């Protein structure tokens, strides 16, 4: 146990030194950062190539890149600028993004979402235990950490939250590579302001698994402030960033002046967002269904998944309409689901959660010593800020001040991350942006009596380095135990323990005589290094808070990187096969529909019985081939079957149009272009 050394002597020289130490940092921060930026540009950034900015969200993710001084938010292969943070596993393939979410209701136990709620946490953590009750997929315990258990490639597999997050990052990376036409290796990734060190480390590990060097972890509200502040640099502004996303809620108070962004205070709730609003509506609609049909769906994960999907759509609709109808065909036991949900009912179900978001707003104002009237702007970030009641409550809290809506709330964080990425890669036009971030929780060590002694206060600008002198608690004490904690409680045991280490071989001396200097170094990513040095002997020990907090080992990361590459190869091989199969199946069904069309202009009305029978037989044979060889046939075999069907159909359709329209008919019934829309649905 340590005790704080209370004996201080300040000589004239020491006082002068202290004054210099205080004055110099005040005089030179901008000069120092400018020099660092120049050094980076000259020596390091060439090796980075293009650096991308990724908003790795709980429910949706988004990627941006700075090109020629302008940020581009990139669309995925479905044309969407936000991608669901979903990963699904089937007997033959892995799906990520829209394709994974679209099949969730039919593959409930093997579709993984909300993984951000688990990353960097221990299995026994209260939050993990709470999540396990709600998540439809299986969570197991491995080495004290949660892992996802799924069926994939006809075997049971377990994946860590870092691996699943790595798969989502791989998707975002591939979106950027498709756009840029080159390989991407470096990124800036955002996290909630309230993520602790373990969660930040785990996010970096996920980037490594995805083949990305994560140059910087940036707080989401800070990234949003960058997006907001680029064109508003005249004078000083105090801004509240109110970030209500799908799974997390963060509030930050920032000061923006002359391109300098300083986070003054942060607060939030790691388990509050749009999905929680959805859950309350799902619970309500489930009870309504039970009353009407006497069927309890609470244990039916497939039904809950269907209802959850439709509830999310309804919630979005209610942001612009007063009511909407939720309809699901064959919901349970062949019974259709049909209910009207009004905006008023949605607000009634969630009003307590909406009001709960105001507490962190009060907290950041209190932490920074600000009044409501000191706030110049309110910035809305996250899709859930589109909810009218949320905006109304927030504006009422600020005595009628209107929230700024100049940023697309879904894209603001990725935009800011892309700007920071541009800074790190040396992009023109962004070199004058300075980012001052803060640590979200107080950091300290346990001293005599179990007290939490603070070294770095909550909301201290980072990077930072703080030292303090401690001493021994007993005579001739040879060893001191340094136990590192994060949190706001007075006693160390009530806070989150980050790690521990010992400083040994302290020479015998009365208690209070040895001088043990403990130094906390917190880097720009919020990663902590703690060092203890015996000033008498010069001996020191240190720890970087990683494995003691559940971070993956290097061996684990290397293994996961290899597996990620292997899965990428499998994905590539399967993609060609699936596209060929889908192309054949869609063509056969399209042709079947044409043959059955007996309308005046339909193909069926123009065919004689023999030709119709020939086509029916060929289509039936094709569909049977698909059914019998769904998993076993190769891409080439599916393509051969399609050509066989085209060879049967083309002469018949050509004959109908006198042979002159053969090309048109072949395009209609045979060309790949005719069913591209089906091939890329990935259903």
Curated annotation (Swiss-Prot):
ATP binds at residues 57-60, 116, 246-248, 312-319, 383-386. One of its GO terms (molecular function) is ATP-dependent protein folding chaperone. This is Endoplasmic reticulum chaperone BiP. PANTHER family: HEAT SHOCK PROTEIN 70KDA. Residues 668-683 have a biased composition (Acidic residues). One of its GO terms (biological process) is ERAD pathway. The gene is KAR2. It comes from Debaryomyces hansenii (strain ATCC 36239 / CBS 767 / BCRC 21394 / JCM 1990 / NBRC 0083 / IGC 2968). Gene3D superfamilies: 1.20.1270.10, 3.30.30.30, 3.30.420.40, Actin, Chain A, domain 4 (3.90.640.10), Substrate Binding Domain Of DNAk, Chain A, domain 1 (2.60.34.10).
